[in-house]
Amino acid sequence: MNLPEREPGQVRIGIAIEIPEPYAADLSAARVAAEDPLADSIPPHITLLGPTVLDAKQLADARDHLAAVAAAAPPFTVRLRGTATFRPVSPVVFVALAQGISECEQLEASVRSGILGGELRFNYHPHVTIAHEVPDAALDKAFDAMSDYSAEFDVDRFYQYEHGDDGIWRPQSAFPLG
């Protein structure tokens, strides 16, 4: 995972839609089965803003921004179906969104503005990672194992996560939609 450097007095955050149970357990198990070294560090999610470093004193303004974004967005439904990959550009296999793509795109654009504005490394494509930076055989196995996967859930909030010194991403604040 490409993580921006963090200095003393800074925090590394990410913004994401949490995948609810029982689906989170399924997706975590798939990532563990792929022997992804980050399987236990990153809960299943749909990224809205990748790892971003802020001065700790900017966090309150960032949370105000996120609250305004969330308040302006209605709840929506996500349907996950099947697998796809970013190969050969990036060694990632993911479960794809079949519904909720445009809503995620709109949320991502709104989140990635103002105090959280910045350039993207890749074009935004909402997904749930199940294997990342593992050997090709493990990527292929993850792709095949979850190819028939399907789940549907309502999204009524997103979360601000913080990357701890122990390498674990933990939710810090919830932002209800609508």
Kindly label every feature range from the protein language model.
Residues 1-77, 85, 100-157, 170-178:
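Basic, often amphipathic N-terminal segments
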Residues 77-80, 87-92:
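Structural motif corresponding to the early beta-alpha repeats
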Residues 88-89, 135, 165:
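Short strand-connecting beta-turns/loops that link adjacent beta-strands
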Residues 90-98, 104:
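Charge-rich, low-complexity N-terminal segments
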Residues 97, 163, 177:
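Active-site donor-binding loop signature of nucleotide-sugar glycosyltransferases
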Residues 156-166:
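Short beta-strand segments and strand-loop junctions that repeat across beta-rich extracellular domains
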